[in-house]
Amino acid sequence: MTSFELNTAWYSLSAVLLLLCLSSVAAAEPPPVIDESMTSAVSNELELLKEEETVSIASRYEQPISQAPSNVYVITDEDIRQSGAIDLPTVLRRVPGLEIMQMTGGDFNVSARGGNQPFANKMLVMVDGRSIYGDVQGTVFWKSIPVTLPEIKRIEVLKGPASAMYGFNAFDGVINIITKSPEEMKGTTLQFGGGELGTISSAAVHAGTIGKFGYRLSIGRDQTQQWRDRDALGFRSNKFNLQTEYALSSTSKLQVSGGLVDTNRYDGQVGEVTSNSIRPSLAYANVLYEQGAFLIRAWWSGYTDNATITPNSQLVDLLSITDRNGQSTNPFSGNTYNVDVQHATNLWATHRLLYGATYRHNSLSSTTIDRFSREDRLGLFIQDEWRAASSLTIVAGLRYDLHTQITGTWSPRVAILYQPVEGHTFHLSGSAAYRPPTLFESHQDQRVTTTLPTGVPFPPSILSTVPISGSTRLAPEQIISYEAGYQGWYWKHRLRVRADLFFNHVSDLIGSRITSGGASEFVNDQGSADIYGGEAGIEFLASRWLSGFANYAYEEIGQSFSGTVKRGAPRSKVSAGLRTEWDNGLSGEISYYYVGATTYPIAQTFTTLATIPTTGVIAPGDRVDSYNLLNLRVGYRFWQQKAAAGYMRDAEVAVSVFNALNDEHKEHPLGDLIGSRSMGWVTVRF
């Protein structure tokens, strides 16, 4: 074991012992004398921890989580703060059934229930109901989320198909990042985190209200070095965000927001045979009007990039991937325009009807596609929530989506919720979803030049160039899902138990195939996959100062897919955590994650070139070993005071360690070796 590993292990052990000692001391020592307002604030926060969450992701309107017709999990702002994470995928690891794959210092893939892969494209991600999923390429830039971490109020995670509500791309599920209102974030919040690998996570947020007008302004800067080369920059971004809202009446409001994320270094994305270097800039503008149960939203998002397409390190001397002009650095420019309209109404005493429509226009310009491309989408949806009896609710929804590139699709969802006694709910559901081909998959136009050494003086090498093409004949990917589950409250709402079983049938996945003459083209794989399994977990509040969670997820995959569209996922995953927080300002969290060994498909390019002795290529193994991830955080809130405006001012310092055991591991055969990282944090709100 190296000195670095010894130091990291010793530091991790010391942090655990320190947290346990602090638990004993803080539990034993008498509480400090504090004013009544602080006591009231702590009491109110405790009561909130006992309450059932209200979510809006499942039905597009707010409802108790136990009444949601889909499987929903909530991550709070406290979960984010106490995690010590510098990015959201690290926080999302606690959600049972989600799969997180870190490829590099900048590149993450997030999916659910067996759907993860490089360039994962089957999870719809939104911020305040506005999609940040890049339709034109099927991409989510997880390190370039357009809000800072302190602005996030909660994250709602829906596992399973949700096209009945959200249309295309809600394939594996939906993640909605909900931000704090100007009233909730009133004042100025400054946060700075810095640590190993040149890591910086910083944010400055100012929010307030003036009469009926509210505003929130934020800036942020994030950066980190590469895992494989700790002296090389892996990611750096600057972000700006502004949200304003005006209360037109007690039941209506107008909201206008906009922002920009400029990423000047993004180590990734890692593809089947590439390890790219991209520099995406993401901008948006959003207008929302809400009047009671009626909502209309219009937004625009823009995407520009200059991406350098680089072959995998083993292939860099053998392959060259360029646009049709022979350039390996390619410009991209994409735009999305979207309008959503929805209305909910109560019919009689037992029905709640939701209906609405979505129109979207996408365009993409790049030298890597055959021409400037555009598409139009129109979706119409309706859902009825029928309270058939006091203990029985039936939810049925249907959506029809039109698309200029493919035939129309119908996406149904039916859910039955049975509550035999208060606090205990059983649910049974079935749904279907689609992911259409992206503009890039339909119109790709690139070239691959292969240089094969001969091993003789003349000719020293043989060159060949073949096209990589998209196809306008692609059908949408499809998933049909069935789920049964239970959630119940025990111990006076201090313990929640959840358990779910699922079965997914996946077909028509889009992948690249080598055709005659060595050319490559996107096609729909003729195979299919049946993915089934279950998840179980508990969340508990043991006392005012101790809470925790524990989850287990299991899945099996039977499939006839071939090539790189084959599904790969760990059979077993475990997540667990303990959190302590005391009146004297001390807090801490220990979270543990186990991910089982996994086999992922490797591109045929590697295996083909490995058979030619002169190339020196060794095909990567398709298996990644299991790994254990232990994350730690200890914090101390040394100042707290109630402001004249009614909110709490405070200041906190903290130390966090990612992968405290330094279990170096890969999460994909082509990914980097992930190590440990220690951070120091300062957060002030005034």
Regions found by a protein language model. Give the residues of each.
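Short acidic/polar hinge/loop motifs at secondary-structure boundaries
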Residues: 131-159
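Extracytoplasmic beta-strand/coil segments of soluble accessory domains associated
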Residues: 57, 64, 89-134
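Membrane-embedded beta-barrel scaffold of Gram-negative outer-membrane proteins
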Residues: 295-309, 419, 427, 459-466, ...
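N-terminal Sec signal peptide and the immediately downstream disordered periplasmic leader
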Residues: 2-4, 16-85, 89-95, 250, ...
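Periplasmic-side early beta-strands and strand-to-turn transitions of outer-membrane beta-barrels
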Residues: 163-164, 176, 184, 193, ...
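Conserved C-terminal beta-signal and adjacent last beta-strands/turns
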Residues: 245-247, 567-686
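Gram-negative outer-membrane beta-barrel transporters
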Residues: 354, 387-391, 498-506, 524-604, ...
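Flexible loop and strand-edge segments within Gram-negative outer membrane beta-barrel domains
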Residues: 224-231, 235-237, 252-336, 367-368
